[in-house]
Amino acid sequence: MTRSLVINTASHAVPIRREFRMAELTDRFGTMVFSEEVMKDYLPKDIWKRLAATLEGGEPLDLDVANAVAHAMKVWAISKGATHYAHWFQPLSGITSEKHDSFLEPNHDGTAITKFTGKNLIQGEPDASSFPNGGLRATFEARGYTAWDPTSPAFIKDDVLCIPTAFCSYTGEALDKKTPLLRSMSALSRESKRVLALFGKTPKKVVPSVGDEQEYFLIKKDAYRKRRDLVITGRTLFGAAPCKGQELEEHYFGAIRPTVSSYMKDLDDELWALGIPAKTKHNAVAPCQHELAPVYGEVNEAIDQNLVMMEKMKLIASRHDLVCLLHEKPFEGINGSGKHNNWSLGTESENLLDPGDTPLDNLQFIVFLTAVIEAVDNYQELLRASVASAGNDHRLGANEAPPAIMSIFLGDQLTEVVEKIIDGKASVHATRGVLDLGADTLPKLMQDNTDRNRTSPFAFTGNKFEFRACGSEQNVSDSNLVLDAAVAKSLKSFADALEGTPEDEFQDAALEYCKKVLTDHQRILFSGDGYSDEWPVEAEKRGLANNKTTADALPAFVSDKAIALFEETGVLTKAEAQCRYDCKLEKYNKLMNIEATTMVREARRTYRPVITAYPTKVAKGLETIRAAGAEAAMQCEQNTLNKLCNGITTINDSIKALDAVHQKAEALDGQEQANVYAHEVVPAMDTLRAAVDAMEEIVAADYWPVPTYDDILFYV
């Protein structure tokens, strides 16, 4: 019954119709954002100039300016239908938090006014002990503060004015994802400006930009509700492979189904109104998998927008009778979902990672390229730790995503450039070629300066680096703050070494410096197949780390090397870094506990009763066949019965084994607990899953208690 209900519901799904004219796009874009253009319209000129000094130059914000901004923000928000405001922040859980306060203020005579002051704008006071804090706040030390981040614009979401804020403790420690990210941006800007000054340039600031390609799955809500493992953990803990997966390679860039297209259009509409520049949408590799990519933006605002985007993706899916799955691996045997973090660095006038047509002649680019290579090699384990999570462990190294080994892919042209610098042959350069496709009706194409290597975790793609190891569900603040801090450290080393060099000697000295650094860190460059069995062996020879699980990776976050980096760049104190390690570890352990508990309970209560009862039906059929004297058919049924009985024994043994190692893990805590979960509980879960999945392929479809992969993946 379950299977037929799912199929019947899906086959009669009708896409939600909506009216939308592309001519409205430019007028609609950003209408729910208190942008700089809106500020100019609502603020007096002198107030706007003083606020602009804060936005552009980091000048302190005076209270009279805050009061004027708050009043303008309130008037604008109410005109858009907002009734409440909220300090919108990112605690260490990685998701967003908000508390809604009404603009209404009652009078003593029973009437009411609307009120929103500068103090309401710039500071809030949530309970710091109720959020993940790694021990920085005890229950009796509840006070924490949210502080307005004027560099990320306020926006209206569901009739609530959301004000992006930082979150810190009463004693000043950062308790959020945003604060250290902003610090890393400052460090990177500071050191980049020092380097650019050596080239005679004085930009106002240097800003890292990010474009995050978001992958996700869409499935029918009815099927989702019938899968308790999906509801509780975000992924299927059981499920045999579907009859057809992604092997035909027909879903990637394929025609988008009407139901999904309708969802995507509604999502675009809401994101555009929120000023989120959603640009590209398409089917991804796996069935029911899709991707949404925005235009690049300043990293702080881009991450804010990605968090809003993920929230909207889930909300709008529900309106369409769908469920949006952001877990990194909701289905076994087909691709999981990632979030490719496209990172670049620029000033108000140039992209510092643009090599130009002759990169070997572009010394400034070579310096910044060298800094990135040095940063990734020096802090490879820290970068790996920044993307570590229970969900992402299922992707990394699984021949669908980059391996857990950090390496850099530069492409043939830049690899040649690096080799020439190392060899001292700086007079020869590569230039971009022209691709002739061999047909008169097709245009000639300019060849990019890199090919694409989908197996590389950190690939140069023309004028940016694509960090492909990030998980789809993750807040990528950690990845970006680590990258920012590491590159800032490399640039600082360059500036310290080269400042004071006579102008006529600078180019030779800079190239010689790059030659030494590239020689020392050439091991991190790899252009081959990251999925191959040979690469881990080669990586070990090169001395590259291979931290396969979250439990293996997280200690790097509090290594002496990491703490020194964080403290030198001013991104995190030792206590703040320890806090983040503790929170990540605690989250991993809690998620693994939930998964193991759910798996044992589902195996006992949902799957085993059906699998145990089914042999009775087979045995009755066997007796009927025996009475009929059909020897061949009888042998077939006997084999099925034997498989079922053996399978039941295997399932029972697997449940006991998982229970035992789970109890062992529960008796521990911290890193020891994580080690047991990663290296003992997960293998035991895999064994139990394999035993149940084997029975799914034998038990009749009408008996199976939950929707199968075939039911879920092909009826949206």
Each language-model region and where it sits:
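Composition- and surface-driven signal marking solvent-exposed, interaction-prone regions
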Residues: 231, 306, 328-329, 355-358, ...
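Flexible inter-domain linker/hinge segments
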Residues: 3-12, 18-37, 186, 190-194, ...
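Active-site core of metal-dependent hydrolases
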Residues: 28-141
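C-terminal amphipathic alpha-helical interaction region
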Residues: 517-716
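N-terminal hydrophobic targeting/anchoring segments and the immediately downstream early-domain regions
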Residues: 2-22, 139-155, 160
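Glycine-rich, acidic/polar active-site loops that bind/position phosphate-bearing ligands
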Residues: 142-326, 335-338, 345-582
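Gly-rich Lys/Arg/Thr-decorated short loops/hinges at beta-loop-alpha junctions or inter-strand turns
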Residues: 22-35, 54-56, 243-252
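Active-site-proximal loop/turn and secondary-structure-junction residues that shape catalytic pockets
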Residues: 65-69, 89-91, 119-120, 167, ...
